[in-house]
């Protein structure tokens, strides 16, 4: 009997250990982005669960989006984001991916837009470490290295592990783009390897501002204008500026920022017609300046007629115009956490 027990107990223990190992392996295979993000931010599985909770379907998708953006895989970002989800972080990454692929303006009204919060993540004393860690991505891609470095430093400081390859690698990249070889070597020594200097990093170098200026952290418009002045070919920064104006419903600022030779987009045509209608002029020169087509003008007249006939009731039959800037301009409101508009 004792001999049998000596055989059964080790066998049962081995079986239990095997089942446990298979459970954890299965979880890692089921949630690969969760565990990859843990490694990228210097967290073991226990710390990851403590600070970010257990892995689940929604967090796996969001972490996958963050990792794809960090690697510059914009097709994957667009594949993983969905217009059916009202999530500010998803909108932030979706907009950035569209800007990197040159289609921000054309896609803006087809996705959930929480006003300017879908373009930039503001950081204050209430911001979570996770959001802080993502806040610098847009500035890095647009070429605002001072803001990108500040965000990376904050992310490192507020990270639960106070380290992480993701943040150190980004700081190395920023200093490589800025041409600070001494700082690059410092981060390479900490990382223990040399980051890959890909062509996209050389392209970002052409976007960086040649002069710096004092500005408030939330003064996005001034910083975008500085980037555009430094490099007028920075199309992503220009689209971000124009889309910022439009999401804030600042039509006058949009017209001023658009200039005499702004880019062509159906979104910009729609916004221009609101301005032209409000100013009481639709001269052919102005229509040409904003690249307004006959179809856009015809649909604007139809939208205005339906809207005025219903005296502003949002239940009016305007479904076919739901993805236009006119609809956003008339009906979009920002609801805060306390329910106020």
Language-model segments: what does each one mean?
Residues 2-4, 44, 57, 82, ...:
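Serine/threonine-rich low-complexity intrinsically disordered regions
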Residues 47-213, 236-247:
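Soluble catalytic regions of membrane-associated enzymes that act on cell-envelope
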Residues 12, 339-340:
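Polar low-complexity intrinsically disordered regions
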Residues 99-121, 176-187, 195-224, 251, ...:
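Alpha-helical linker/edge segments of TPR/alpha-solenoid repeat scaffolds
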Residues 1, 23-42, 61, 65-73, ...:
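Ser/Thr/Asn(+Pro)-rich, low-complexity disordered segments
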Residues 1-56, 62-65, 95, 198, ...:
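Hydrophobic/aromatic interaction determinants used to assemble and anchor large protein complexes
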């Amino acid at each position: 009997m004792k001999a049998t027990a000596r055989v059964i107990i080790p066998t049962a223990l081995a079986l239990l250990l095997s089942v446990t190992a298979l459970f954890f392996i299965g979880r890692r295979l089921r949630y690969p982005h969760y565990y990859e993000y843990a490694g990228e931010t210097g967290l073991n599985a226990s710390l990851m669960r403590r600070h970010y909770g257990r892995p689940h379907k929604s967090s796996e998708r969001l972490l996958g989006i963050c990792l794809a953006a960090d690697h510059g895989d914009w097709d994957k970002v667009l594949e993983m984001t969905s217009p059916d989800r009202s999530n500010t972080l998803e909108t932030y990454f979706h907009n950035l991916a569209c800007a990197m692929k040159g289609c921000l303006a054309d896609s803006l009204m087809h996705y959930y837009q929480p006003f300017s919060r879908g373009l930039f993540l503001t950081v204050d004393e209430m911001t979570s470490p996770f959001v802080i860690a993502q806040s610098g991505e847009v500035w890095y891609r647009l070429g605002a290295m001072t803001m990108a470095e500040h965000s990376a430093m904050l992310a490192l400081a507020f990270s639960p592990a106070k380290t992480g390859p993701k943040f150190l690698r980004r700081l190395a990249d920023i200093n490589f783009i800025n041409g600070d070889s001494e700082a690059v070597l410092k981060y390479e020594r900490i990382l223990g390897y040399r980051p890959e200097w890909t062509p996209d990093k050389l392209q970002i170098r052409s976007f960086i501002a040649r002069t710096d200026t004092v500005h408030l952290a939330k003064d996005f418009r001034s910083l975008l204008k500085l980037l555009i002045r430094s490099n007028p070919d920075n199309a992503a920064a220009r689209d971000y500026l124009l889309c910022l104006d439009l999401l804030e419903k600042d039509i006058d600022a949009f017209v001023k920022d658009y200039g005499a030779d702004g880019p062509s987009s159906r979104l910009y045509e729609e916004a221009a017609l609101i301005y032209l209608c409000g100013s009481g002029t639709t001269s052919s020169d102005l229509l040409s300046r904003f690249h307004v087509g006959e179809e856009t003008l015809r649909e604007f007249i139809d939208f205005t007629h339906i809207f005025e006939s219903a005296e502003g009731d949002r239940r009016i039959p305007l479904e076919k115009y739901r993805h236009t800037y006119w609809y956003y301009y008339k009906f979009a409101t920002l609801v805060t956490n306390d329910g106020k508009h």
